[in-house]
Structures are given as C-alpha cells and as structure tokens.
From Swiss-Prot:
The keyword Transport does not apply. Residues 246-256, 361-373, 401-417 have a biased composition (Basic and acidic residues). This is Putative cuticle collagen 99. Residues 67-79, 231-243, 540-549 have a biased composition (Pro residues). PANTHER family: COL_CUTICLE_N DOMAIN-CONTAINING PROTEIN-RELATED, COLLAGEN ALPHA. Belongs to the cuticular collagen family. Glycans are attached at N446, N535. Transmembrane segments: none annotated. Residues 142-201, 230-263, 268-296, 394-439, 479-536, 538-576, 577-636 are annotated as: Triple-helical region. It comes from Caenorhabditis briggsae.
Length: 686
C-alpha cells in the first residue's frame, strides 16, 4: 500500500515514470511491510528484555481436531517478486588479475580522452561505466562492500525432534586374560595301535662249541640188590655239541614297505655343450651371374678450373646406385675445394619506362633571396620655369596601380591562453530514448571477463575510440599533467619464434686486419705449354695429389674351396636328457629267510569319544550373582510430542504404586482370581 501511494505521488509530481532509485526504495518499503505482516517482529530495543517471556510462551499445537475443509479456488497471479539479495562476497566469482588489468586499461583510455561522442558514452554506460557527478571523469562500478554487522539475536525456537538412533560405538579394548582353567578328566584308553615296522634281521649263527672229552669206559654191570638208592650225584660235565642242524625253511614274504620319499625333478640340470662337428664338404662352384644393363652416365670428379670429363652412353637404362666408396685421403692440413667457374651473366633489364609515380609532398619554403642591385636613376621630367627660375609643382597625378602582395612574414610566437569562458545555458531535456538491449555482464559465471563483452569492445567500441582519438590528436588539445607511474606488469608468456627476416644490407667495409698465417699449399696448376726450343725435358715436378676413388669393379668369380679346418675345441656338455620310460617289471625274487620279531609299535592315536553317559543328579544352585549393570536407555521415537492430556495407562511419567493407585485396584477387581497377578514370588530351594 505504501509503495502504491508513493508511486502515485511521484507520478502526480513529475508526470513521468519512476526512476531506478525510487523503484528500489519502493521495493524495500514493500519488503518491510510484508515481513511485519507475516511475522510478529518485536522491536529491536526490547528484544533482550522479552526474550525469556517469548521463549517460555508456547502455542497449543494440534488443538483443532476438525477435518480440513475443501480446497479453495486458485488466487490471482501475484505481483512480480522482489529482486534477490546480493550473494555473499565469498560466493561471488573472482576476476583474475589479467582480466582486471584489461578493464583498467580501457578505463585509462576513457579517462585520457574525456570529450567523446554521446553514442560512445551510451555504450560505456551499457558496459557498467558511468560519468562522475561533475561530468569530467568516467567511473567504473566498484566491487561490493564488506558484509554488514550481525543482526539482533533471534527468538528462541521450538524444541527440536529427537535425533535418530546413534551408530554403534567403537570396539572396546581387549580385556585382561582369564585365569587358567581346571585340569580336565582323564580320557578313555585308546584302541590298540598299528603294528610296528619290521625289525632288522638277526645276527648269523655263532661259532661251534669246543669238543668235549671222550667218554670213560663203562663200569661193571651191577647186580640187583636190595640196597637203597643213594642220592643223585652232581651234574656231570657238559657233553659235546651235536651235529649242525639242517637249514630252516624260507620265511614268509614280508609286508609291503612304506612309500619312499619324493625323488628329485625329472628334468636334470643342463649338460655341457657338445663338441662342435667337423666342417662340411665345400660346395660346388655356382653358375656365373647375369651381366647387368649398362648405365646412362657416369660423371667423374672435377679437375682444376672447372674442367669436367664425362662419359655419355647412347643407350641403356640407369643402373642401381653403387655402394659408397672409401673416403679420400687428404694430404693437406685443410682440404679446400676448387673455385668453380663464374656464373652466366644475367639478362638485361627491361627498358620500358614505368608509369609515372604519385606527386611528391610539397617541399619546404626556400630561404629568402638576397637584395637586388639598385637601379639606374630615371630621366628628369620637364619642368616649367616661372618667376625667377623656380620650378612650379603641378597638381597630383592619378593614383598608381596596386603593388605586388608582400611576402609572408615569419611565424609569430604562441599567444597566452585565454580565460575560461562562462558556462553555457542548460539545455532542454531530450526525448525519452528507446529501450536498450539487454546488458552484458562484465564478469562471466566462471570468474573471467565475458567473451561477448570482448567481442563488442573489439568490433564496436574500439573502432570508435580510435577514430575519436585520431580526431582529437589533430586539434589543439592541451594534455594534462602526467599521472604517477603505474606498477610494473607481470611478465607475459614468451611468444612464438618469429619468421626469419630478410637478409640485411651488406655492412661497411671493416678495417684491414693483421696478416694471417701462411695458408696450405695450393692445388697443382695446369701443365705449361711445351716449348720447341729443344729436346731437353724440364725437371720432374712434385707428385700430385691422390686422385678420386675409382668406381667399384665387377664382382669377381667365386674363390676356390678352402682346406678343411682343424679340429675344434671340445664343446660344453649338452643339457641333461629327458627321463627315460619306465622299465619292464622284473622277475619275482626268491623267498628270503624269516626275519626276527619286530619291536612293539608306537602308541596309536586317540580313539573317538564314547557314547554319552546318563545324566547326573542336578547339583545345588550356586550363590546369587552380583547385581548387573544398568540397561541401555530406551529409544525415542522420531515424532513430535502430542498435547498434554489426562494420565493414561503405561504413558504417565509419574510412577504408580500398585497397592494404593485407584486405577490399579479397579483393574484387579475386574480380573478373575486365576489371572490375578501374584504380588510375591517364591523360589524352590532344594
């Protein structure tokens, strides 16, 4: 409402549309009205005094239990929303330093040339650049200011919902090791063990005993009498050993032996290299190869003074290039090539006269010439003599012709600067312009300068600036005082290597240098002309330089077979061969003698447990244990609390006494005798 009245007053007073500042002020007032209507915002001064009362006051929630009414009709479309608040400074895109320097350079150009056209100023305003209040400078919209101070303390909120069940806590530290347990009962006797291994064979039969003495002669035959038989005499000496017994039978076949240990790898180590074989029989001579086609031209090396010798063939295709020859031997410390013949003179230039060039610039004014010689005196005119011989002067003659225009004088000195003129009258306000196009943001969402802005600056704004700057340079513009030197810019990236420039002009001839060292000997000269003075031959000259390497000759015939070579050294032993196949099964051996009795085997493993015995008599109950720890607290349901009501069963926070409570006594009265809850419990003791 306030915004509407404000707009009406503005329209009545000015008769025009609202300006941007009035519109923003109207939106701010509307926002305050809406906030005051929707929320009861207490005054700022009394927020601390009434904070406790507001916190204690609590509205009744869910007090209305009526069913919801039918949905209403859709309301009219509301007014356009208010502009959003500016983003905090830490969420705004940051402009890189290079982009800031680019904008600052443009602003400096605008500051330097202030008298610009109106079309340029409109485009500058579209890019966020504004004139200063006095109209003498151009300003750039600055960065947003720091965040304002913190607002007053808000009202105390309603109690929050209970949080969800927490996660399991971390695993505790390991406990102390327990005491050693009592010794267990002895287990049952295990089954008999497996038979032990077969014993070793006993020692062979010992040596024969010594032969005893011959028997004594027999005594006389006794007579049977009635005499009593005396006690037995002492044992006689041992008798001679009897004859050796026969060999016993072969013993039974023994049990199968235990499996042996795993053998080594089937593939043995690599053997030594064998001896090299003898050289083979030399092969027979091969057939001669076909002759190649003749080449076209073979140029030889150049002789002194550029004379070359060549051999040209009339027919034949060019053969393949031969292999490179051996490098030549140079006997001089530095090989210098022979200077070639002079080149063919070029064609003479064209004699056609080209078109006449453009007229040259006007030359400067020449110096003033010297003063000419004085002319001869003129002839005196005819004078009339009157009265005493005096000459009478006649009437003045007609005016003479205009003289020649004088020469231009020298340029005068600069005059003093005039006073500043009075300000002109204020012009009438112009007509309202058309609505401009949508502006372009200076900074892109990613924090860099907008590419569309760069294109507009290059295509539209920069050409206009260049034209106006070129016009201002020709006028009498008095430059202002030089500004302070700016900070040193960052080093730019190294540019790509440029193209090679044209060859420069020959330099000036330098001073004559010092005498150099003696050079190497020159090449041999041409042979001199033979003189016919006599048959005497001159002295023999020095040997010439080695000639160029000759061409490679044809392939020679294959050589004779060589003699057989000597016997080579023994080679390294070869690798071990693969394991051979299994042999055939051998014949069954003879039955061996019976072996001695084996030793008792080791104790066998423990047998399986026996069947469960009969249950024993129940023991006496143990002593009462210690009191347990406190239980885990109950879980809170994640739901809002309901309104406070009458006490209900199992929901009241007040503990109830089972003997004195009225509700408990009524419940017990309604229950039958069999379902009544016993008040005491008895424990059976043995």
């Amino acid at each position: 409402m306030c915004c509407y009245l404000f707009q009406q007053r503005e329209r009545e007073r000015k008769g025009t549309l609202l300006t941007g500042e009035a519109y923003k002020l109207c939106e701010t007032i509307t926002l305050l009205d809406v906030l005051q209507i929707e929320q009861d915002i207490p005054p700022i001064g009394n927020s601390d005094d009434n904070s406790d009362d507001v916190a204690k006051s609590r509205k009744v929630r869910n007090s209305c239990m009526c069913p919801p009414g039918p949905p209403g009709e859709r309301g009219p479309v509301g007014p356009p929303g208010l502009p959003g608040l500016p983003a905090p400074y830490y969420r705004r895109p940051r402009v890189p330093l290079s982009n800031v320097v680019f904008v600052v350079v443009i602003v400096i150009v605008f500051f330097k040339f202030q008298n610009l056209d109106e079309s340029i100023s409109r485009k500058m305003r579209a890019f966020g650049m504004l004139y200063s209040p006095d109209g003498q400078a151009i300003q750039l919209r600055g960065m947003p200011g720091p965040p304002g101070p913190a607002g007053p303390k808000g009202l105390r909120g309603y109690p929050g919902f209970p949080g969800p069940i927490g996660l399991d806590g971390p695993r505790g530290l390991p406990g102390t090791p327990g005491s050693k347990g009592e010794r267990g009962e002895r287990g049952p006797v295990g089954p008999p063990g497996f038979p032990g291994p077969k014993g070793d064979r006993g020692v062979m039969t010992g040596p024969f005993g010594v032969h005893g003495q011959h028997p004594a002669p027999s005594g006389p035959i006794g007579h049977h009498t009635t005499m009593n038989i005396g006690p037995p005499g002492p044992p006689g000496p041992p008798g001679p050993p009897g004859p050796a017994g026969r060999d016993g039978r072969h013993g039974m076949k023994g049990d199968r032996g235990l499996p042996g240990f795993d053998g080594e790898s089937k593939i043995g180590p690599k053997g030594e290299t064998g001896n090299p074989g003898r050289d083979g029989i030399p092969g027979a001579r091969g057939p001669p190869g076909e002759r190649g086609e003749k080449g076209d031209t073979a140029f030889l090396s150049t002789y002194p003074r550029g004379q070359s010798v060549s051999t040209v063939s009339s027919s034949g295709s060019q053969g393949p290039p031969g292999p490179p020859g051996p490098p030549g031997v140079c006997q001089v410390s530095q090989c210098i090539g022979v200077q070639g013949p002079p080149g063919i003179p070029g064609e003479p230039g064209r004699t056609i006269i080209g078109p006449q060039g453009p007229p040259g610039e006007k030359g400067e004014r020449g110096e003033r010439g010297e003063t000419g010689d004085k002319g001869p005196p003129g002839t005196p005119g005819a004078a009339s003599l009157l009265n005493g011989g005096k000459a009478l002067v006649g009437p003045p003659g007609p005016p003479g012709r205009d003289g020649r225009p004088g020469e231009k004088g020298e340029k005068g000195e600069h005059g003093l600067r005039g006073d500043m003129g009075l300000p002109g009258p204020e012009g009438t306000p112009g007509k309202r312009g058309r609505r401009g196009r949508h502006g372009i943001s200076l900074v892109a969402p990613n924090g860099t300068i907008n590419e569309d802005l760069k294109k507009l600056l290059k295509t539209e704004l920069m050409p206009l600036l260049i034209e106006d700057i070129s016009e201002l340079r020709g006028k009498n513009v008095i430059p202002g005082p030089p500004g302070p030197p700016g900070p040193r810019g960052h080093h730019g990236p190294i540019g790509p290597a440029g193209e090679r420039g044209p060859q420069g002009l020959p330099g000036h001839s330098g001073e004559r240098g010092e005498r150099g060292d003696i050079g190497p000997p020159g090449l041999p000269g041409q042979p001199g002309a033979a003189e016919s003075s006599g048959n005497q031959s001159g002295p023999r000259g020095p040997p010439g330089l080695p000639g160029p390497p000759g061409e490679k000759g044809d392939l020679g015939p294959p050589g004779l077979p060589g003699q057989p070579g000597a016997l080579g050294l023994p080679g390294h032993p070869g690798p071990m061969g693969l394991r051979g196949p299994h042999g055939t099964e051998g014949k069954q051996g003879k039955q061996g003698p019976e072996g001695p009795k084996g030793y008792p085997g080791p104790m066998g493993p423990q047998g399986p447990p026996g069947n469960d015995g009969e249950p024993g008599i129940d023991g006496r109950p143990g002593p009462a244990g210690e009191k347990g720890d406190q239980g885990i607290p109950g879980l809170d349901a994640p739901c809002p609390t309901g309104p406070d009501g009458l006490p209900l069963p199992y929901c009241s926070w007040k503990p109830m006494d089972g003997k004195n409570d009225v509700w408990e006594r009524r419940k017990r009265a309604t229950l039958p005798r069999s379902e009544s809850v016993p008040e005491e419990r008895t424990y059976i003791k043995n």
